[in-house]
């Protein structure tokens, strides 16, 4: 047993001295008894003379110099497999849902994996062109997801990232038979609680593993909790399952890295972020991939500070994604939810060879009408609608109907909106927007398109107006 002693404590950073012959490796887990409770430290730096600098995976309150520290001689290990399904665990894999210890259904031994693992090699990786239906019109039409791909939900504060994330989980987890892993990185405890009950009410909790590191936790927890969730997802993938990995919020992972970097004494780079921002993001994102054994489809919420998409944190995330969904405050102000901006949202899947020519043409038609409407808005604001040509008047009418039709009542928001949730099949979505573009519903009033599912519901609603 290799032991050392604490020589310095600065908040979440703890320096530990070992003999020079037995200095722990980087990322090794150390154990210290802090007034009867076990605290885990993770080695971040070797300072020389046998001293290592560590980050505490919990509160450092109560620690003092001279306390005995034990090197566990491996990285942080967490439980993986079916024992985690339906349970909430923390960064160390310890259950925090007050349901007792984790156990496998067949009472077999629980397997433990280290959270620091190598990304799959190039020869093991697999790409898929299969489109994953979400039941949300604007996503399925404009920025379709690929099975085994990575999706980012970008948005500032209060534009609906978490609600969109919860709706996606509810829709995909209900329709999709595989396992899901939800990782809450530095988010509100209330949202975690809401999410747990939403999964329970939707009867999909027994297929979901929940890993939480809330915003009141020390930076070490928030920095590593994404790896805990990813490790659980990797286990399911390696067993041949198609896994959904939800991360809310990837920005908090970056922020925790910034805090840890400052505590470790590194000189900050642009906008105060850590100099290792790209590397830290890459280490996480490179492991989120599909292999010849199974797939991981990842959906990540990304907070955009001050609605600035050029901020280094969201900008670094962009390069790793297959689909980007941008939430717009301007669309929120129009009362249209989900507030997804169809002109700023993209997907590599929107290709006629993948989604088919009809889907591609309809998506492009919707975009071009909305783009032209955007250009005409200034003329309308200054001169009014009367100055537009007849063709432009028709185009504006269709654009406003498209805008309204892009709204959709969510299952997870029923309690707030009063509208019952709708799941819209991809074919119904394409047919609905095709009818608007071709002018088949020009006679239907604009209000009928708001907060409905398919185009048939629009016709029914218009009869009541």
UniProtKB/Swiss-Prot annotation:
GO terms, molecular function: ATP binding; ATP hydrolysis activity; proton-transporting ATP synthase activity, rotational mechanism
UniProt-listed Pfam families: ATP-synt_ab, ATP-synt_ab_N, ATP-synt_VA_C
Membrane topology per record: Peripheral membrane protein
PROSITE patterns for this protein: ATPASE_ALPHA_BETA
GO cellular component, one term: proton-transporting ATP synthase complex
Subcellular location per the Swiss-Prot or TrEMBL entry: Cell membrane
Disulfides per UniProt: none
Annotated binding of ATP, by residue: 155-162
Highest taxon of source: Bacteria
Function per UniProt: Produces ATP from ADP in the presence of a proton gradient across the membrane. The catalytic sites are hosted primarily by the beta subunits.
Stored HAMAP family: ATP_synth_beta_bact
Protein name, as recorded: ATP synthase subunit beta
Organism annotation: Buchnera aphidicola subsp. Baizongia pistaciae (strain Bp)
Lineage start: Bacteria, Pseudomonadati, Pseudomonadota, Gammaproteobacteria, Enterobacterales
